[in-house]
Amino acid sequence: MKIWIDADAAPRDVKDLVFRASRRLMIEVTLVANRPVPLPPANRLVSAITVREGADVADRFIATHAQPGDVAITADIPLAAQLVAKDVFVVDPRGELLDDRNIGGRLAARDFFDAARGAGMETAGPKPYSQRDRIAFAATLDRILTRAIKRRDASPPNAPPADAPSTLEPPPDSPQDPNA
């Protein structure tokens, strides 16, 4: 399991909270941006990847490399939709969990406002990042990391499928089922 941060627009508070969680839970974090981003000192679990400049280059990198069960932090709704489809846990910087129940509505709203702006309509930008957003993000991140860790620990990466026959022999002194 890994945490991916769409780092071009992620608030510093979000990155700091993720860095602390990384250190506490021993989870790898990768920041992806089209410019160099500062890394926390003395945390080898955190790395950064600088992609070439261009529209959605960082998003495509994250979408390509994130795996089911990973966690991604992004405010980019099209990227979130791609990640949700890959069974990646997605949290926006304001603490909203984006999943298959709400991503369609968020994508439709994003497309509507994008079309309105394209037609010359002025739309309000996002509100400034607040302490309430920080608290909501911290709570959601904690909840999602707990779920992701439970999922990871419940299914080891090299576990055989549930219907595969066991190749393990019972211990010599264990009772054996005569009907087996």
Predicted feature locations:
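Nuclease catalytic cores that cleave nucleic-acid phosphodiester bonds
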Residues: 1-163, 168-180
